[in-house]
Swiss-Prot record:
Pathway: Lipid metabolism. One of its GO terms (molecular function) is iron ion binding. Belongs to the sterol desaturase family. The chain crosses the membrane at residues 13-33, 37-57, 85-105, 120-140, 189-209. Disruption phenotype: Mutation affects the membrane lipid composition, particularly ornithine lipids. Mutant is deficient in OL hydroxylation. GO terms for biological process: lipid biosynthetic process. The gene is olsE. Residues 126-260 form the Fatty acid hydroxylase domain. It comes from Rhizobium tropici. Disulfide bonds: none annotated. The keyword Thylakoid does not apply. It is a multi-pass membrane protein. One of its GO terms (cellular component) is plasma membrane. Its EC number is 1.-.-.-. This is Ornithine lipid hydroxylase OlsE.
Amino acid sequence: MIFQSSSRLYAAVSSLLWPAILCAGLTGAYFAFRSDMHLLWFNVVYLSTVAIIALFERLMPYEKTWQKRDGETFNDIAHTLLTKGGVQIAAAIGTSFPMAVATVAQPALSYHSHFWPDQWPMAFQVVLGLVIAEFGLYMAHRLAHEHLSLWRFHALHHSVGRLWVINTGRFHFIDTLFKIALGQIPLYLLGAPLPVFLWIGAVTAFIGLLTHCNVDMRTGPLDLIFSTPRLHRWHHSKVLAEGNTNYGENLVIWDQLLGTFHNPPRPSSTDIGITGKVAKGFLAQLAQPFSRKGRKEIIGKKPKELILQEEQAAKAAAARRNANAKIRKSG
C-alpha cells in the first residue's frame, strides 16, 4: 500500500475512485462507439478498466484476505468469456434471444412501438432505458434468489469466497440469458433504438466491474442511487437476511421502492459465499445444475451457526422497522 488508510490522500482517493473510474470508462465507450470498430475499441477500454481496478485492488484493498488465490481464476475467466463473449457475438451479428422474442411479439404489440420517445436527447433516452431495464434485471435477480429452479444456476456466481474484479462475469450462461431476456425484451417491444442498448451495456459493464472489485471505495450518498461495492458485498453475504437484498444491477431504485434495500451503518460483510457446494471444473460447473445430485449439492445444508446468524439478523431488521414506524407515527 502506497499510502496509509488513515491519511487524507487515502480518504480523497477512496471517495473519488468510483465516480472517476465510471466516468473514464463511459468516456472511453463514447469514443469507441464513434469509431468504425466499436466492439474492438470498447473491449480495449473495458480491459484497460479491469487493469486499473486490479492495480487499486493491490494498493488499497477492502479485504486483504481476498487477495489470496482461491483456485477459481481459470473458471472465472472461462465463464466470463462464455457469457460476455456470447453477448458480444450476438450484438455483432445483430441477433440475440431477447431480440428474437421481441421480433415474434412485436407485430401483436405494434401499437407500443411508437411509445419510445426517440425525439428526446440520447442521454435522457439512456436514463429511461436504464430504469426500465433495471426493473427486469431486478426481477430476474430476485427470482433467482427466491426460487430454487433458478437459484441452481445463479448459485455459481455466489459460490466464491472472495470478490475481485476477475470474478465479475462469473455467471452460468442460463442465468445470463434469463437476465438479458427480462432486462431487454421490454426495450425491444417499446422500440428503443440500438444506441440505447449499447449505452446500457456500457453502463452495466463498468458498474459491474466496480461492484465486484476488492477496493476500499467510500461511496456515501451514491449508495442511495447506484449498485456499489458496499451494497453488493451485503448481497453476497451468507446470511439470507443480508444476502437476499440489494438486487439492483446498476441502480437500486427498485430495491428502494420494493423494500429490499439494505445498508446498515457498519462495515459490509466479508463472510460471503453459499452453504452448498459448487463443482470444481468449468465444464462440471456448467453441467451441475442439470442433474438431481448437482442440484442437491448446490442447495446444501445450512450449518447451525448460520441459522443463528440469520435469526439474529432478521430480529435486528424487524427492530429497525418497528423503530422507524414509531418515528413516522410520532412525526
